[in-house]
Amino acid sequence: MRFGLLERIQSAEALNREELAEYRNALKRLDAICYHASKKNVAVFIDAEESWIQDSIDHLVWLMMKRYNKQRVVVYNTFQMYRHDRLQFLQESYEFANSKGFVLGAKLVRGAYMEKERKRAEEKGYPSPIQPNKQATDKDYDAAVLFCLQHLENIALFVGTHNEQSCMKA
């Protein structure tokens, strides 16, 4: 799926006929990937990378989780904890998964695109989605790990970090 299409979806712009067809085709391809992964007993990790397409990707991931994360976890969403809203979103995702009867696949990472995100926010005139400092990122990352560990009955956790202290806490 084109990046520009994800941006249009994120901003709730109306899609034309060709864009709708492109979206449907991308959804079919993603579904095929998840289907084959489930048959081969492997996981699929999905990551938006940029905040300005994150909601679009989150929606697609939820569709796939609802379909494939019933018996076991196939699909994981990536939660970039350098964003100040991701701990709350993780908790909301857990509640959503519970309400819809699927297991949440959560890959936790700190994130690596701080400068890019801050620069874009400044250029576009919106508040930065990034934590104010590394300590805040570490705090939310560790809180997210703890939250997942406390809810393993309905969360499959992948801890993506090189941080020794976070590994020891997990």
Regions found by a protein language model. Name each.
Residues 1-170:
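Positively charged, amphipathic and often flexible ligand-engagement surfaces
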